Amino acid sequence: MRYLTAGESHGPQLTAILEGVPAGLELRAEHINKELARRQKGYGRGRRMQIEKDEVKIVGGVRHGKTLGSPIALVVENRDFQHWQTIMAVEPIDDETEVKRKVTRPRPGHADLNGALKYGHRDMRNVLERSSARETTVRVAAGAVAKRLLEEVGIRVAGHVLEIGGVRAEKLDYRSLDELQKVTEESPVRCFDPEAGQKMMEAIDLAKKNGDSIGGIVEVIVEGVPAGVGSYVHYDRKLDAKIAAAIVSINAFKGVEFGIGFEAARRPGSEVHDEIIWSPEQGFSRRTNRAGGFEGGMTTGMPIVVRGVMKPIPTLYKPLGSVDIDTKEPFTASIERSDSCAVPAASVVAEAVVAWEVAAAIVEQFGQDRIDLIKENIERARRYAREF
């Protein structure tokens, strides 16, 4: 399974082409729209979320509510495009006013300057339109399809916010993914700990008041993946490596860890590795899950636990210093409409990219063409693991 996306932040639409999704999977627009709505929520979002109400159009690969096995084409229209039709026109324009509106002041922390250097753009709108986090809309749409596939084979994915602006959730005594999802969906910052959630909102308010932005940490948990998914044979087949790459590919994400993560550097081995246990009912398992569900690039059968670190959004309403690429004069960076904190929304994006990588690994390992055969094969693998 793989996918490609296309489209600009203020262009007419965003498009995703999904290849390798097996035939026979029940899929409707409402499955995807539910995830798109979750992405648009979250305390600290900017005014654009009041403009856009994202809805998907499935324009290929699905008929009568089921996937065909052919590429799936998804389209999400940008409702704000009506205000950008001239400046984002595909054909050449003669409007001198619009031509002169080019972006020549790169924003610190963005792709603007590096992208202009790479592609030779003198108008950095050509960079910022594509590098915008708006592109994650269709990545969430692709992830929704992956989640639908995982649901069919008994695998659950859930995400939540662990930390925003130095405020960390301490109460994480949820008893199931159902409880975690229920509580976080009701939280404006997608935090399970209500006291921490309130302090997170206060931190966001303060950052907004100061014309600043703040980042945080999100966590994604995947339950139900059988042991042995992924591979130790080659570096590029390790599933944890693929998930790590997917996490840091999200806009503004700068770090990733599994299980106890970087804490492992501060502990002795006896407090890092997970003891192996066995029971007639479950077969082999682990006493703890410090490894976060992975050993040797393969799943252990324990829940996958992965965290991603998101830096503060670099678009600031009190801009940092920059230099105009045309005049070479120092200036304060240009301002695009932005959020003061996008960590809650980013947790939904993180769910999506993790779901896609897990689903792709499941399809690769347990059969590629039909969902019914994949379900049979994965159930056979679960029985084998219990009886091993």
Curated annotation (Swiss-Prot):
- Per the record, the gene is aroC
Q: Write down the species.
A: Geobacillus thermodenitrificans (strain NG80-2)
Q: Which family does it belong to?
A: Belongs to the chorismate synthase family.
Name this polypeptide is given:
Chorismate synthase
Biological role stated in the UniProt entry: This reaction introduces a second double bond into the aromatic ring system.
Known pathway = Metabolic intermediate biosynthesis; chorismate biosynthesis; chorismate from D-erythrose 4-phosphate and phosphoenolpyruvate: step 7/7
In terms of HAMAP family, this protein maps to: Chorismate_synth (MF_00300)
Q: Name one GO cellular component term.
A: cytosol
Explain how, and how many, cofactor molecules are bound: Reduced FMN (FMNH(2)).
* Names of the cofactor(s): FMNH2
